Each structure stands twice: as C-alpha cells, then as structure tokens.
Design a protein with these regions (language model features):
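N-terminal acidic leader/helix
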Residues: 1-27
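Short, charge-rich amphipathic interface segments used for partner binding and complex assembly
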Residues: 26-61
Length: 61
C-alpha cells in the first residue's frame, strides 16, 4: 500500500500539472486557437478528476 507521503507527492505533482495545463489552455484561448484550447480543457478536467479521486482515496485509506 502506498504511504501517505507518496500519495501527497502524487497529489502535489498532479496539481502542478493541472495548473500548467490550465495556463496553456487559457493561453490557447487568448491566441484564438480554439481547437487546442478545447483539448487542453478536456485534459484539465481529466487531471482534476484524477486529483479529486487521489485526494479522496488518501482521506479514506
């Protein structure tokens, strides 16, 4: 079973990645690249879901 420290580290990494993808998506919107923005926002939603599941798991484990 993963340790609390491992779960915390993964959560932090996912949060940072999610923030970076969100920034890229916003940049794509600002430059008018709607196709890229749409895909990046989809990735952001998926990462956000993974982050919520990981955090929920860490609180129940």
């Amino acid at each position: 079973m993963p340790s609390d420290a491992e779960i915390s580290s993964l959560s932090s990494t996912l949060k940072e990645l999610n923030d970076r993808v969100a920034a890229l998506a916003e940049s794509a919107v600002a430059t008018g690249n709607e196709d890229m923005a749409r895909e990046l926002f989809a990735v952001e939603r998926a990462l956000g879901g993974a982050l919520r599941r990981l955090r929920r798991f860490s609180h129940t484990a």
